[in-house]
Amino acid sequence: MADNRTFTMIKPDAVENGHIGGILDQITASGFRIVALKLTQMTQRDAETFYAVHNERPFFGELVEFMTRGPIVAAILEKDNAVEDFRTLIGATNPEDAAEGTIRKKYAKSIGENAVHGSDSDENAQIEGAFHFAGREMF
């Protein structure tokens, strides 16, 4: 069911700072099951396509540059109410506004380098997951 899965990326800043293990531990400790996982690097074209919804925003160029500067960890997660529960787990986009104990409060540096991406809807979770994973890569 769509509402049982969400998509996340551990962004280049968190990968560079060695936070993959801590973030994945927090995700699984919160009841999510990892159904797809890979370390990869987005090309400029990948990032421009993935973030196309933001292409008119003033931060688009910086976002693409940031997301292509190093590897990311892409994952599809499964849990009842996955999208909403994961967005609660990661916290506000700006780590200064994120609740204590959230992933962004623990691992993000700034609003621009905020450690993780989380899908904002069931529909986007499906689209974003399919962008990074073929059907045979999901379990």
From Swiss-Prot:
Pfam families: NDK
Superkingdom of origin organism: Bacteria
Catalytic activities: a 2'-deoxyribonucleoside 5'-diphosphate + ATP = a 2'-deoxyribonucleoside 5'-triphosphate + ADP; a ribonucleoside 5'-diphosphate + ATP = a ribonucleoside 5'-triphosphate + ADP
Gene Ontology CC terms, in alphabetical order: cytoplasm
Binding positions for ATP per the UniProt entry: K11, F59, R87, T93, R104, N114
Keywords: ATP-binding, Cytoplasm, Kinase, Magnesium, Metal-binding, Nucleotide metabolism, Nucleotide-binding, Phosphoprotein, Transferase
Enzyme Commission code: 2.7.4.6
SMART domains (UniProt xref): NDK (SM00562)
Presence of the UniProt keyword Secreted in the record: no
Subunit note: Homotetramer.
Its biological purpose: Major role in the synthesis of nucleoside triphosphates other than ATP. The ATP gamma phosphate is transferred to the NDP beta phosphate via a ping-pong mechanism, using a phosphorylated active-site intermediate.
Name recorded for this polypeptide: Nucleoside diphosphate kinase
